[in-house]
Amino acid sequence: MKRRVVVTGIGAVSPIGIGSSNMWENAKVGKLGIDFITQFDTEESKVKIAGEVKGFDPCEIMDKMEARRTARFTQFALYAAEEAFKQSGLDISKEDTLRCGVNVASGIGGLPVIQRECLRGDKHCYDRVSPLFVPSSITNMAAGMIAIKLGFKGSCTCVVTACASASDSIGAAFHYIRDGYSDVMACGGAESCICELGIGGFSSMKALSDSDDPTRASIPFDKERNGFVMGEGSGILILEEYEHAVKRGAKILGEVVGYGASCDANHMTAPLEDGSGAAACMTLAIRDAGIEPCEIGYINAHGTGTPLNDKGETKAVKLAFGEHSKELLISSTKSMTGHLLGASGAIEAVMTIKALEEQFAPPTVGYKVPDENCDLKICPNEGVDFDSEYAMSNSLGFGGHNASLIFKRV
């Protein structure tokens, strides 16, 4: 018999708030976390706007020595993990640590560290790069450091599926508990690659918005959209087997009931134009949850703000939900946070859990010009109340990776 899996802790670091409560309260009122880049001089950069995390101090959770030895994406992950763990109320001394695992994703890992050490090697010699270069930059280090911090000694893995990474991480952790391999999992994602190399790489492939107006840069589903805005941050969830959580008197924030994954198997970066790949993962998630499409009331869309993605995701929703697609409330919180790449699915999972808890769909800010090719029931500029037990969060990534998660209100 498959076991139930619930959420007992959430943590977040995002461009619209440090801490999950701060982030959610700001999301509800449509706070924009997108502004001009401050982390490097953009004079020679075509793209000058991003969703930076402002006011983050890693020394709130670690000493100065550890902060110097740890990449920014890992710092974000550790902060979010600590928040989620504290909220869960878990006492590791009372747990079988081999039944507590970690699955925390990152799409790119410590890219700013790689850039910095490459420049150092070019200037001096490569024997003089930092001895911490490799351990601080590798993508799995956020997961490893969380395991160390929390004392979780079970499975510790890192999913890398581009912008679907965090959703795949949560989905894998969900199945791992449901199928009996673990009782507790810390899962989610972390990303921080707002640097010359990161911005330049995505800019050169015409993926980023080159708008010079922060309020019109990340505009998912708007007819004038012209690319995504890079964001940074982390979202971490503590998942637990239902009876395990009830036995210790944990507060349950929500339930994970479905996960679907598919691949377009079509192109390195472009989604299938007919939306069939993304539709497949939504359908698989619905089937995994054992519910009907009409039972879902809200979708936190992938909604990046690129011309192809939003058009394709619209088609996918229509394929997966049929007539019910006309009734579904849909928003893209990337309009506020920017696109956190491998961490986006985790931040958006937190948003979806909070949306279900409060029965409130956050807005898609900056939405002005409707697009006939994106004719879904978008929540434009203001949030909307809804009444539904179930909500979905979608993530789609380069390489054709598609992931959908379904959460249930408790």
Q: What residue ranges belong to the model's regions?
A:
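Short glycine/threonine-rich loop-to-helix capping motif typified by GTGT followed
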Residues: 266-275, 304-321, 340-347, 380
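ACP-dependent fatty acid/polyketide chain-elongation machinery
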Residues: 1-66, 243-252, 350-364, 408-410
